[in-house]
């Protein structure tokens, strides 16, 4: 699961990121609405945790804007506003749940997991672009109903490309997903992984579906 944490407090944002990563999830952390918009469009998170007190845009405004643009992912709000009127406003804006500050991170984790369980019955766990199919729960790629054996990194790349079908995904974006720690990133690693992934796909589907867009990144597109 990929989680987007939108929180301007650097220390709290770090603690949330560490806890969520320790639970086995991928995390993108944004300090403001502008950065949150970038991660929303580039990485397509499964759930967002949003603080209302952002420096460049009120969190409620951000949530309303996302919902008006048909962004349907579950949203958990962090807020210091405690009145029932404030809570009604949060939910009316489009949030699915909220946690009031101060809070224990364990409560945030529990509510996040509850939202994902609730949402799993509504959201499709399969991305289907015949003959390609990605099973999000099993983390498997199938071509013509044949499961392709991929490493964890190869699967992450494939899922990202298919989620962005018809759109160029930058190498930097892929690197960030594979290696959250900047010290571990090496640009040639993506080239090696992409080469292996292409070979595995072409063994089942000879037509080229992943192309390199020079100076921009990679594109998955069925022709």
From Swiss-Prot:
DNA-binding region: 124-222
Subcellular location: Cytoplasm
Alphabetical list of SMART domains matching this protein: REC, Trans_reg_C
Record-annotated disulphide pairs: none
Matching Pfam families: Response_reg (PF00072), Trans_reg_C (PF00486)
UniProtKB keywords: Activator, Cytoplasm, DNA-binding, Phosphoprotein, Repressor, Transcription, Transcription regulation, Two-component regulatory system
A Gene Ontology term for the protein's cellular component: cytosol
Induction: The phoP/phoQ operon is positively autoregulated by both PhoP and PhoQ in a Mg(2+)-dependent manner, inhibited at high Mg(2+) concentrations. Induced by dsbA disruption and dithiothreitol.
Response regulatory domain residues: 2-116
MF terms (GO), sorted A to Z: DNA-binding transcription activator activity; identical protein binding; phosphorelay response regulator activity; transcription cis-regulatory region binding
Any Gene Ontology biological process: positive regulation of DNA-templated transcription
Gene3D superfamilies to which the protein is assigned, alphabetical: 3.40.50.2300, 6.10.250.690, Winged helix-like DNA-binding domain superfamily/Winged helix DNA-binding domain (1.10.10.10)
Summary of activators and inhibitors of this protein: Feedback inhibited by MgrB, which seems to bind PhoQ, altering its activity and that of downstream effector PhoP. PhoP-regulated transcription is redox-sensitive, being activated when the periplasm becomes more reducing (deletion of dsbA/dsbB, or treatment with dithiothreitol). MgrB acts between DsbA/DsbB and PhoP/PhoQ in this pathway.
Modification sites for 4-aspartylphosphate: 51
Disruption phenotype: Altered expression of 33 genes; 9 are down-regulated, the rest up-regulated.
Entry comment on modification after translation: Phosphorylated by PhoQ.
Lineage top rank: taxon: Bacteria
Physiological role: Member of the two-component regulatory system PhoP/PhoQ involved in adaptation to low Mg(2+) environments and the control of acid resistance genes. In low periplasmic Mg(2+), PhoQ phosphorylates PhoP, resulting in the expression of PhoP-activated genes (PAG) and repression of PhoP-repressed genes (PRG). In high periplasmic Mg(2+), PhoQ dephosphorylates phospho-PhoP, resulting in the repression of PAG and may lead to expression of some PRG. Mediates magnesium influx to the cytosol by activation of MgtA.
Miscellaneous section: There is a close linkage between the Rcs and PhoQ/P signaling systems, and both signaling systems respond to certain external divalent cations (zinc and magnesium). Two-component regulatory system EvgA/EvgS interacts with PhoP/PhoQ via signal transduction mediated by phospho-EvgA.
Subunit annotation: Monomer in the inactive, unphosphorylated state and dimer in the active, phosphorylated state.
Name of the protein: Transcriptional regulatory protein PhoP
Organism per entry: Escherichia coli (strain K12)
Lineage, uppermost ranks: Bacteria, Pseudomonadati, Pseudomonadota, Gammaproteobacteria, Enterobacterales
Primary gene name: phoP
